[in-house]
């Protein structure tokens, strides 16, 4: 049911919600040929006979009391060079803004240079991707959605030299508690794990001439 920030409830039944959605969609439909009427749209939604909207669209469509996303989930990132500190912070800000509006967020960290890589600032070397996992995780815990924590998925390519540290960070109790994590495995890694052969990680992960490489035992990491 639609409610405002003071807790006032403006819908008393699922029918009220379906009429709100139908009226708003009909308002947009009216701008185009062969538009469906609000009643026709309502009949599609009623008792979820033919259409079952996602949770966020059910909340956001025609809602004059909240700024809510019209999609449940978003995959975000930065076009171009994305391993600068500014780009990393920009992703964090975008993540928070989406979560404030009920959006679940997923993004990949394979663009972040691995630990020990040279950087052009006073630190001289990169901290790697694990501290930024924690940053994004903490942002998720800080953003409440009507009492519910935001939803975050972080991923990394197995080809990234920090992928093992990425896995370990989630396994460490209390470290990355605001995110689910996923490692993207490729055929070369799985073949190396099966055959007991070494596997070469690199950064950038798609570079023909990578700036950094690291050889690992694929079967040991798999276990």
Name each region found by the language model:
Residues 1-223:
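Extended catalytic cores of very large enzyme megasubunits
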